[in-house]
Regions:
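Extreme N-terminal, non-catalytic leader segments
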Residues: 1-5
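Conserved lysine of the Walker
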Residues: 17
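Small-molecule kinase domains that catalyze NTP-dependent phosphoryl transfer to phosphate-bearing small molecules
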Residues: 69, 122-174, 178-181
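Hydrophobic positions on the alpha1 helix immediately C-terminal to the Walker A/P-loop
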Residues: 20
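ATP-dependent small-molecule kinase phosphotransfer cores
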Residues: 30-96, 132-135
Length: 184
């Protein structure tokens, strides 16, 4: 099977991007990269705790100051195919990554109630405890501000949308099928 040289992942919080990344890395040998890692590095450089409630405004600040595709611009030089880019949250990041020949964007999604339940299970610092708080945080990630997170607009650019509302086995099958369909 011919595989895309660079695969990008986008999707809302707790949709299964991490599990999708594991499948691509462990089963297909993709080298993992994350735009969030670029933010974590910047947060640490500034002496900030690299948690979601710090990273989101930091990312918005960087996009305003240096352009909406800045995180992808910083990462693109580190990519050596086969590579996986996780945490794509702005259409300008997709635009930058589309400069890589054969780049494919996968959007991972699941119903909000299931994603909230997954979020509670993983219990990361700063994760929403109530469904109301979860929805509120999600609304903040879907803004019209070109320098902010625009998850819905980013997902709309996906080459393939994967629904992750079933089992891990189902997700694995969907991911491998998507990679095969997108291979060149």
């Amino acid at each position: 099977m011919v595989r895309p040289p660079v695969i990008g992942l986008t999707g809302p919080n707790s949709s299964g991007k991490g599990k999708t990344a594991e499948i691509l890395v462990e089963e297909l040998g993709y080298a993992p990269h994350s735009l969030s890692d670029m933010l974590r590095e910047e947060a640490r450089r500034r002496g900030l705790e690299p948690v979601r409630d710090v990273l989101i405004p930091l990312g918005n600040e960087l996009r305003r100051a240096r352009g909406a595709g800045v995180l992808a611009e910083l990462l693109i030089e580190r990519l050596c195919p086969p590579a996986l880019v996780d945490s794509i949250r702005n259409p300008a990041e997709v635009e930058v990554l589309r400069r890589v020949p054969g780049f494919v964007l996968l959007a991972i999604d699941a119903p909000v109630e299931l994603r909230h339940a997954r979020s509670l299970e993983r219990a990361r610092p700063g994760d929403a405890r109530t469904i109301e708080e979860f929805n509120e945080k999600e609304q903040r990630e879907n803004t019209a501000d070109p320098s902010a997170q625009q998850l819905a607009a980013t997902a709309a650019l996906a080459d393939v949308v994967i629904s992750n509302s079933g089992s891990l086995r189902d997700l694995r099958r969907e991911v491998l099928d998507a990679v095969e369909r997108c291979g060149h």
